[in-house]
Amino acid sequence: MINYLRGQAIEVIKTPNNRLILILDVNQIGYEIQIPSRLALDIGNNNNDSCQIFTHLLLREEQPLLYGFGTAPERELFRQLLSVNGVGAQLALALIDTLGIEELVVAIVTGNTKILSKTPGVGLKTAERIALELKTKLAAWRQLREATTTITAILPAAAILEDVQMTLLALGYSQEEIDRAMAVLSQDALFSKNTQPEDWIKGAINWLG
């Protein structure tokens, strides 16, 4: 599985069926990656400089297809959409392109089918199905993502944070468990001002049980 590709954006080609294909040169190998129009615009604004694309490989009988996104959360949302019955890759891309990641997640979590139906090809029944099947999953995902984003502004210096993470890893906790614990602790007003790694370690261990 290809997690991401980093290379030189050669060009973005628009196919006859209006799909945008990025030609990405990685070590003299040109990859064809279908991307959302929002990402194509970003690449154009950056004068086709070196970029990192988070990819999803979709295996079809005819040929394998690569889809690319500017961020890992966008790719994760794309994958969540693909898990919904009746939602294919093109519709998932259209949803992300039309609404953007934040508005799309909010619409799904709140069950706002009117907003979801703004996307071409998404009727009321499809919108209802998306909201029904993903509401709970995306509510938890959104909460963790927001908490993780908040950590950057709240946690102590990077060196202290590294000490905390290395200690917890040495104690046998996984990186995912550590991230969850730190996300929760960062919401505590006392921890947000604490610069003692020992306190963060104890707090994480207590939370993880």
From Swiss-Prot:
GO molecular function: ATP binding; four-way junction DNA binding; four-way junction helicase activity
Region spans: Domain I: 1-70
Residues covered by region (Domain II): 71-149
Spans annotated as Domain III: 158-209
Example of a GO biological process term: DNA repair
Pfam hit, one: HHH_5
Cross-referenced CDD domains: UBA_RuvA_C (cd14332)
GO cellular component: cytoplasm; Holliday junction helicase complex; Holliday junction resolvase complex
Segments for region (Flexible linker): 150-158
Keywords: Cytoplasm, DNA damage, DNA recombination, DNA repair, DNA-binding
Subcellular localization(s) per the UniProt record: Cytoplasm
Principal subcellular localization: cytoplasm
Keyword Disulfide bond assigned: no
Domain notes: Has three domains with a flexible linker between the domains II and III and assumes an 'L' shape. Domain III is highly mobile and contacts RuvB.
Homology family: Belongs to the RuvA family.
Subunit structure and binding partners: Homotetramer. Forms an RuvA(8)-RuvB(12)-Holliday junction (HJ) complex. HJ DNA is sandwiched between 2 RuvA tetramers; dsDNA enters through RuvA and exits via RuvB. An RuvB hexamer assembles on each DNA strand where it exits the tetramer. Each RuvB hexamer is contacted by two RuvA subunits (via domain III) on 2 adjacent RuvB subunits; this complex drives branch migration. In the full resolvosome a probable DNA-RuvA(4)-RuvB(12)-RuvC(2) complex forms which resolves the HJ.
Purpose: The RuvA-RuvB-RuvC complex processes Holliday junction (HJ) DNA during genetic recombination and DNA repair, while the RuvA-RuvB complex plays an important role in the rescue of blocked DNA replication forks via replication fork reversal (RFR). RuvA specifically binds to HJ cruciform DNA, conferring on it an open structure. The RuvB hexamer acts as an ATP-dependent pump, pulling dsDNA into and through the RuvAB complex. HJ branch migration allows RuvC to scan DNA until it finds its consensus sequence, where it cleaves and resolves the cruciform DNA.
Name under which the protein is recorded: Holliday junction branch migration complex subunit RuvA
Upper taxonomic lineage: Bacteria, Bacillati, Cyanobacteriota, Cyanophyceae, Oscillatoriophycideae
GN (gene name): ruvA
